[in-house]
Amino acid sequence: QVAQTLGLDRDHAINLGLPGLMSADLVELVKTGKMSEMNTLSGCQYDYPEIVEYLKEADIISIQMGSNDAFVPTVVAIGNATNWKSEDLASIVLSGNLRSKDPETRAAFQASMKKLKLTKSETDAVWNLVTSGMNKICTDAYPVSTANIRSVVETVRALNPDAQILLIGATNPVPLLPSWSNYFNKLNKFQKQLAEVYDIDYVAVPYAQ
């Protein structure tokens, strides 16, 4: 929808989205074209020297980041809590099927939990994560994400002073969790304000208020 509004098509676009990339990783990539070391949480390490030249030559650059700073640590925490029985739960989160707050969404989450066949201690660990652990994850992620978003915007603007920069709202995959809703609401508010400061365009998307 964003591309259609701007009159763009995929034939003239390069998708530089990389799976598992967290905001600190993107800071390195836009500055040097590579990550200095593996991200131990996501397991990714990218060496992509072309990215800097692509950014220098682009007419329009869209940036969407911040979601993985909360999402990746949460997936790892769920894995640790369930002794890595959590593939079904991770899959349903990744699918986006938990983006609604309706009863069907809650039922899907509960059904996914049942499939895990967790022990009592594992179940307790998961619910502790949901009720308090995720709040810490999101609280820790916010200052990191905001600092890195600012750094990426500044770096991209320095590389290409003339490009139109679109700062795309971060999407919340699980809005039924209060800690996540708070994180993404704050993150997108920050991005809107940042866009005004740097005279770039903020683009809201569904589940990115």
Name each model feature, range by range.
Residues I14-G20, D201-Q209:
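Acidic carboxylate-rich catalytic motifs and surrounding loops in phosphoryl-/glycosyl-chemistry enzymes
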Residues I63, L167-I168:
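Structural beta-sheet core signal
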Residues Y46, S151, K186:
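Short, conserved clusters of charged catalytic residues that mark active-site
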Residues L6-L8, N148-L167, F190-V203:
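A structural motif corresponding to the C-terminal end of an alpha-helix
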Residues P143, I168, N172-Y207:
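Substrate-gating cap/lid alpha-helix
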Residues V2-P143, A147:
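Conserved SGNH/GDSL esterase-like catalytic core that processes O-acyl groups on lipids
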